[in-house]
């Protein structure tokens, strides 16, 4: 009799634990900050792909920058981790007595990393040195950058307030300095106008209308407005008061023209005169080539630093014109349901993107087995990378968390891997859309949910 009593007691405890697990986890999505939100959650064990927890896992929601997990993983799948881009430079005509009777011609290879702050390349200075070593003192023709007129289209679902700011830099055949320029502003007392100290690099043909004022707020709340063909860009908003120099970054919509101006300036400093008398279309000789970092290195910064430009480059690598179609085909090819996907860009900036949490988690389970460190190393690390500081503040999480964040107005998203106390590795995706509470509280709720997962 005593045996049966103990048996029934143990059975009740086990059943109680099993029944409570989803109920306990569900309570996180019933808190005040989540009351009006649309929430999708998917958690699976990477070892066998079995479901650990689901909550609206099939609901299509805005992923923000979590979309980069698709761009990076599929680029690695299709192109391998060692692919590189090549930029070639030629001179046309003949060099006689220091005079180049022709042009300098740059053949872009789609490299998104030329003189990027994320890599040490020195493309501009190395090209200038190569021209000088040829003994050129004068260039009769021009500097020609091929495909310069191929202006990329802005996705129609990008917000107007984003388009002129650095994180909306478009991917071009020729890219330079992350297609970003920096406006340094000086501020005075709160409420007073600011002034432009410098623009680096200078942007030919574009004027700035500065309407930014000084503020007691200690944050960057200044925005740039204007499309790619605008001759005048407006700057509005506020920056902290009493700053001698405060940086506001904009999207460089015509990187080829900016680079040409920089190259001409540097050549002049070296005593090389660009005469621009005529374009001489003759045979050309390659004299300088730049190879980009490996694809896995570009993927690393795409996810670690959430670089939209790099993500758009990877999207073009996957498919120059049909990224969404290719994503669906590749996911279906590896057995992942793609029916709930809507994709309007490759970086996650579009407010029209929609993904089911379950689809992204399935991709993570697949990537863990097939892509290895080239993909896994690109994910932000808890306790190390600044983007995860809220999520990994808990000691239970910390280094046990590797995940990509996503955020835009009304959206908080997180997707990656979690190592549990049991020694298991879980792949998870959490999308929270249209919340009305404090975004930090939303992130803290996600953190507490992950903590509960980790200790069960």
Where are these regions (language model features)?
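Bacterial Sec-dependent N-terminal signal peptides
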Residues: 1-24
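Beta-lactamase-like hydrolase cores
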Residues: 18-60, 81, 86, 121, ...
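Conserved serine DD-peptidase/penicillin-binding transpeptidase domain
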Residues: 28, 78-338, 455-456
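Short, ordered coil/turn segments that flank beta-strands lining enzyme active or ligand-binding pockets
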Residues: 47, 189, 421
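Residue-level preference for non-acidic, small/hydrophobic
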Residues: 49, 66-75, 143, 174, ...
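Small-residue-rich helix-loop
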Residues: 52-54, 272, 290, 305, ...
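Short active-site loop at a secondary-structure junction
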Residues: 54-70, 74, 78, 299
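A generic structural motif
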Residues: 59, 110-112, 434-436
């Amino acid at each position: 009799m005593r045996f049966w009593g103990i048996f029934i007691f143990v059975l009740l405890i086990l059943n109680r634990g099993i029944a409570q697990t989803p109920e306990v986890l569900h309570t996180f999505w019933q808190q005040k900050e989540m009351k009006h939100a649309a929430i999708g959650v998917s958690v699976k064990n990477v070892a066998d792909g079995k479901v650990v927890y689901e909550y609206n896992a099939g609901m299509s929601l805005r992923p923000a920058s979590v979309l980069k997990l698709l761009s990076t993983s599929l680029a690695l799948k299709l192109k391998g981790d060692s692919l590189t881009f090549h930029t070639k430079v030629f001179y046309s005509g003949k060099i006689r007595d220091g005079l180049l009777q022709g042009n300098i011609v740059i053949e872009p290879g789609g490299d998104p990393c030329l003189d990027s702050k994320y890599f040490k390349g020195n493309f501009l200075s190395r090209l200038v040195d190569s021209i000088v070593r040829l003994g050129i003192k004068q260039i009769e023709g021009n500097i020609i950058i091929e495909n310069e007129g191929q202006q990329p289209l802005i996705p129609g679902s990008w917000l107007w307030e984003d388009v002129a700011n650095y994180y909306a830099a478009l991917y071009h055949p020729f890219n330079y300095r992350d297609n970003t320029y920096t406006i340094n502003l000086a501020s005075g007392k709160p409420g007073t106008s600011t002034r432009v100290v410098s623009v680096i690099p200078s942007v030919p043909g574009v004027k700035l209308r500065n309407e930014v004022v000084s503020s007691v707020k200690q944050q960057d709340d200044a925005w740039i407005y204007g499309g790619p063909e605008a001759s005048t860009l407006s700057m509005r908003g506020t920056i902290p008061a009493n700053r001698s120099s405060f940086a506001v970054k904009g999207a460089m919509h015509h990187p080829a023209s900016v680079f040409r101006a920089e190259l001409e300036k540097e050549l002049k400093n070296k005593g090389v005169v660009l005469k621009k008398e005529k374009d001489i279309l003759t045979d050309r000789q390659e004299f300088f080539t730049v190879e980009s970092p490996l694809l896995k290195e570009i993927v690393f910064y795409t996810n670690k630093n959430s670089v939209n430009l790099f993500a758009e480059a990877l999207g073009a690598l996957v498919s120059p014109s049909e990224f969404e179609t290719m994503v669906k085909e590749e996911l279906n090819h590896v057995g992942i349901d793609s029916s709930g996907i809507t994709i309007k860009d490759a970086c996650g900036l579009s407010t029209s993107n929609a993904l089911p949490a379950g689809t992204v988690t399935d991709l993570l389970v697949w990537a863990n087995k097939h892509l290895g460190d080239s993909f896994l190393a690109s994910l932000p690390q808890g306790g190390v990378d600044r983007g995860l500081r809220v999520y990994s503040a808990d000691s239970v999480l910390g280094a046990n968390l590797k995940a990509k964040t996503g955020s835009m107005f009304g959206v908080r998203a997180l997707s990656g891997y979690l190592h549990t106390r049991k020694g298991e590795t879980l792949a998870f995706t959490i999308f929270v859309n249209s919340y009305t509470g404090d975004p930090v509280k939303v992130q803290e709720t996600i953190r507490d949910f992950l903590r509960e997962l980790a200790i069960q």
